[in-house]
Amino acid sequence: MSQIKYKRIILKVSGEALAGEKGTGINPEVIKHLAEEIKSVHDMGVEIGIVCGGGNMWRGETGANLGMERAQADYMGMLATIMNGLALQDGLENLGVPTRVQTSIEMRQIAEPYIRRKAMRHLEKGRVVIFGGGTGNPYFSTDTTAALRAAEIDADVILMAKNGVDGVYSADPKVDPNAKKYSELTQLDLISKNLKVMDSTASSLSMDNNIPLVVFNVNKPGNIKKVVMGENIGTVIKGDK
């Protein structure tokens, strides 16, 4: 059997990916598929932390653009990420995968508060940990949350699970047929080429802590396992400069 390349991962799942073709809400079939994909990697002994976005329900930036106070709008977005996390927890536990949800905003009736050392212990015991509520602070994206949690738990990689996009391109491949797919980039490449993979705060955190990223299509069965095993199916963004 091939060697596992990444033994402790942060899987960043966008809210849009959970919505499926509808674009909004939570698609139970998508949850089921994603849970099965995660289980296949969990069964290999990989330690898995997950950060969900909330864009399938609400975006703080959109609310702010409509006249809401930005902090208030962002808190609503944080709650959306927790709803997504609970749905994914249910999908995983239906398959027998022990899963804990930890939130940066306390709501003890439904989830544990985020405690780094407790999260590490869960991972060591073979439990999947879903980090909900973003960083707990407005003005920070869930991409930044993924980079922050990856640094805190000493993850080997951040897997950027994309909805139907199989990597990073020089332009939108749906619009530009000549768009070039990159197999490998650095964090500085993202800035110099203006490639919208993650926001600058998340990118800086990843670069400063030397955490690589892999951008890949999560919709294709087996892709999470392929990435964990080191197959070149997406775009690798090296953690260094």
Swiss-Prot record:
GO terms for biological process: 'de novo' CTP biosynthetic process; UDP biosynthetic process. Residues 20-25 are annotated as: Involved in allosteric activation by GTP. GO terms for molecular function: ATP binding; UMP kinase activity. Transmembrane segments: none annotated. The keyword Signal does not apply. UMP binds at G54, D74, T135, G136, N137, P138, Y139, F140, S141, T142. Allosterically activated by GTP. Inhibited by UTP. The keyword Cytoplasm applies. It is found in: Cytoplasm. Keywords: Allosteric enzyme, ATP-binding, Cytoplasm, Kinase, Nucleotide-binding, Pyrimidine biosynthesis, Transferase. It comes from the Bacteria. Pathway: Pyrimidine metabolism; CTP biosynthesis via de novo pathway; UDP from UMP (UMPK route): step 1/1. It is an enzyme of class 2 (transferase). CDD domains: AAK_UMPK-PyrH-Ec. ATP binds at K12, V13, S14, G15, G55, R59, N163, Y169, D172. Gene3D superfamilies: Acetylglutamate kinase-like. Its main location: cytoplasm. GO terms for cellular component: cytoplasm. InterPro entries: AceGlu_kinase-like_sf, Asp/Glu/Uridylate_kinase, Uridylate_kinase, Uridylate_kinase_bac. Its EC number is 2.7.4.22. It holds the Pfam family AA_kinase. Belongs to the UMP kinase family. Catalyzes the reversible phosphorylation of UMP to UDP. Homohexamer. This is Uridylate kinase. It comes from Lactobacillus gasseri (strain ATCC 33323 / DSM 20243 / BCRC 14619 / CIP 102991 / JCM 1131 / KCTC 3163 / NCIMB 11718 / NCTC 13722 / AM63). The lineage of its organism: Bacteria, Bacillati, Bacillota, Bacilli, Lactobacillales. The gene is pyrH.
